[in-house]
Amino acid sequence: MRGWLAVRLAGLDVTEVVVAPSPEGRVLSDPTVSPSGLVPYLEHRGARVWDSLAIVEYCAELAPALWPADRVARAQARAIAAEMHSGLRGLRLAMPMNLGGAFAGRGRTPEALADIARVEAVWADTRARYGAGGPYLFGAAFGAADAMYAPVVARFLTWAPEISAASRAYVDAVRAHPLVDAWYRAALAEPEAWRIARFEVAA
């Protein structure tokens, strides 16, 4: 989701290849599809880029407006994007991504709740310092940091943890973005056979 959003935000001319997950939930069974054997993976004008954050940075080289123009704001954006990319393990494990699921009240492990509190603190701090003028983390433009947090937004929508009104407003703004909506529509149109049983039942 994150890499795809960055590619579309940057306006790159690419052909999408959708890889079906295995029944165990692994997204790739053919390591020749990408150097890491994982998705997302981008080939563009001779560049081969894997890992979602690397794809975001590559896209930002071609479309610098994906990051804030101000140096200090840009540092904040990169820091919070990297924190999301490398952390939030408790949230990921307890509340896996399932765009068609509805598991309100489930998955609230202590680790997940701690991660949710941290996400809310990051959002509140970033919006207070840089979010004037629009509904996104850095104001009016949906940028790289918002793309990186889109999977967190998806989890909040599926698992419905208790969050503040300000966080809910941000969640709603991200969900309403045309590219995020396009991702949801594509996901919900995937074949029934692609559903992974262990992600269809809440713990």
Where are these regions (language model features)?
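Short, hydrophobic secondary-structure boundary micro-motifs
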Residues: 66-69, 91-94, 135-138, 181-185
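A short structural micro-motif
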Residues: 84, 177, 190-194
